[in-house]
């Protein structure tokens, strides 16, 4: 009988020991995110979570997202520490606009070859995002898939579940003529428009690490983590009447604000009410991007738009600013049957 070389999973490119080492590295930070409703620890086949007892008619709200090609930029610049915050932000910000409190979060991390340091850095960021949003990181999947990804390249996806009282769901149905729109400032491009960002970098020849903008490298502006609005927005909802909230993600102003507008209403945005942060001016100029395309692709300094009764607007701005946000009145709702749902003037 001919001797054959004994093959192992590691020979095929999957290092189970590296996966176990990663779990050991992240246990501590994951534990910090725990909520009282979570039952059991990491490592079960499924994560168990009870519903908070304060809800009379709890409705679960779920969401999933990624960070798009911002990830490519982070990999190229070898900066993995905040991409996990982006991942959580993209999910929990989508939940809170419906009035939901995030409960738990799971992540999926896929790579061709598992680099424990890189993966731990990403998951530390995920845990930080969960802490910022009061959400428990209850589990995840780390998939090492040789032949599927080039080298140390990786991709991430997030999944979040939240809860809202049925009678307090925010769905935009109460939006009315005369409502005031309040903006929450973004921290940068957040996690949208990065294919255009990368194209602008390519065409302009700008090196994000050596190009200075407002006293710091362009890379710092581009990789600034997506702002998580959960805690201040939940406090706003608790204290004041809120009719609708739009999270400005892919599609920018033109596509996200109409998602929360009832028929026969139009959002009128006052362009003079704020100044674009420097990074958006740089992107527009370096890429010769039209104003319409900027508002369609990027948040242009506005992370969320909140519609509420005019009588609540000043109180809302004051409350949000007291909670550490930068908030201002950005426009109003008017009755209109025009096809154009958003006007920026």
Swiss-Prot record:
Q: What is its subcellular localisation?
A: Cytoplasm
Keywords assigned by UniProt, alphabetized: ATP-binding, Cytoplasm, Ligase, Nucleotide-binding, Purine biosynthesis
List GO molecular-function terms, semicolon-separated. ATP binding; phosphoribosylamine-glycine ligase activity; phosphoribosylformylglycinamidine cyclo-ligase activity
Primary location class? cytoplasm
Q: Which GO terms describe its biological process?
A: 'de novo' IMP biosynthetic process; adenine biosynthetic process
Q: Which InterPro entries match?
A: PurM-like_C_dom, PurM-like_C_sf, PurM-like_N, PurM-like_N_sf, PurM_cligase
Catalytic reaction annotation: 2-formamido-N(1)-(5-O-phospho-beta-D-ribosyl)acetamidine + ATP = 5-amino-1-(5-phospho-beta-D-ribosyl)imidazole + ADP + phosphate + H(+)
Q: Which Enzyme Commission number(s) are listed?
A: 6.3.3.1
Q: Name one GO cellular component term.
A: cytosol
Pathway the protein contributes to:
Purine metabolism; IMP biosynthesis via de novo pathway; 5-amino-1-(5-phospho-D-ribosyl)imidazole from N(2)-formyl-N(1)-(5-phospho-D-ribosyl)glycinamide: step 2/2
The answer on whether this UniProt entry bears the keyword Oxidoreductase reads: no
Recorded family membership: Belongs to the AIR synthase family.
Q: What is this protein called?
A: Phosphoribosylformylglycinamidine cyclo-ligase
Q: Which species does this protein come from?
A: Cronobacter sakazakii (strain ATCC BAA-894) (Enterobacter sakazakii)
What gene does this protein come from? Answer: purM
């Amino acid at each position: 009988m001919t001797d054959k070389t004994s093959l192992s999973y590691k020979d095929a490119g999957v290092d189970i020991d590296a996966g176990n080492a990663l779990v050991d590295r992240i246990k501590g930070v994951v534990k910090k995110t725990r909520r009282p409703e979570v039952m059991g620890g990491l490592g079960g086949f499924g994560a168990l979570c009870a519903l908070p007892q304060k809800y009379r008619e709890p409705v679960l709200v779920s969401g999933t997202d990624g960070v798009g090609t911002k990830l490519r930029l982070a990999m190229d610049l070898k900066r993995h520490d905040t991409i996990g915050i982006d991942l959580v932000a993209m999910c929990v910000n989508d939940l809170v606009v419906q009035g939901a409190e995030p409960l738990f979060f799971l992540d999926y991390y896929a790579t061709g070859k598992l680099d424990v340091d890189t993966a731990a850095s990403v998951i530390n960021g995920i845990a930080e995002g969960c802490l910022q949003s009061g959400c428990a990181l209850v589990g995840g999947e780390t998939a090492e898939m040789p032949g599927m990804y080039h080298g140390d390249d990786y991709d991430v996806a997030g999944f979040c579940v939240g809860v809202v009282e049925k009678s307090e769901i925010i769905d935009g149905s109460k939006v009315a003529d005369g409502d005031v729109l309040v903006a929450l400032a973004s921290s940068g491009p957040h996690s949208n428009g990065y294919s255009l960002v990368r194209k602008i970098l390519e065409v302009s020849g700008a090196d994000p690490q050596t190009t200075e903008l407002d006293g710091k490298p362009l890379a710092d502006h581009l990789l600034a983590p997506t702002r998580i609005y959960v805690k201040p927005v939940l406090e706003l909802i608790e204290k004041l009447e809120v009719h609708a909230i739009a999270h400005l993600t892919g599609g920018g102003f033109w596509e996200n604000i109409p998602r929360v507008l009832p028929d026969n209403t139009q959002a009128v945005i006052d362009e003079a009410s704020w100044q674009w942060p420097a990074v958006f001016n740089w992107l527009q100029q370096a890429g010769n991007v039209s104003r319409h395309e900027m508002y369609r692709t990027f948040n242009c300094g506005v992370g969320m738009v909140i519609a509420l009764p005019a009588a609540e607007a000043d109180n809302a701005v004051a409350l949000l600013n007291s909670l550490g946000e930068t908030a201002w009145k950005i426009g109003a709702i008017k009755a209109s049957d025009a096809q154009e749902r958003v006007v920026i003037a």
